[in-house]
Amino acid sequence: ADIGNPKKFNKELEKKYNIQLNDLLSVRSFLDHNRIFEMPNIKNFDLDKITTKSTSAFCTNDTNKIFEPIIFKLSLIEHFQKWKPFISKYGLILLELHTINPKKCSLNIGKTLATAYDATHGFSNQYIIEYEDFIDSATIAGLKNNQAFEYNFPNDKLTTVSINLFSL
């Protein structure tokens, strides 16, 4: 199923297996940053209230146009909003990949795999964003991060891989 289209995924589950997506605990590993990019509807957001400190910039396959980091944060917010109706019962566990600020990376050589992640993902149209923006995007979308089930690797200061349990 297309991770970016939970409505269609739910319909397929109903048709094939007579089960609702909301009746399952949704668990995903490294899929959300690899979803098909959709340009966010910027008019739906108050850009004075949603910010990013991200230094990342990405382009998409169809246009090769470079977009500012805020575009990818807004796209992630919309992605999370699409999933809200389908995670209200049991929640959503995400194992996800993140980038970190290049300055922070340069001060921690050998302590993170951020450079390798950024290079491989940057050339394959996968949009990894900083952990702080990831959590903020989920919060803005109306998801709650259960910190009792939160894990950051290699640590809280250099998070390049996270595990989170989100609920409504």
Language-model features: locations:
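Mobile active-site "lid"/loop adjacent to the S-adenosyl-L-methionine
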Residues: V27-S75, I100-K103
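Core SAM-dependent methyltransferase catalytic element
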Residues: K16-Y17, S137-L168
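Extended alpha-helical interface modules used as scaffolds for assembling large macromolecular complexes
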Residues: K111-H121, Y127-D133, A148-P154
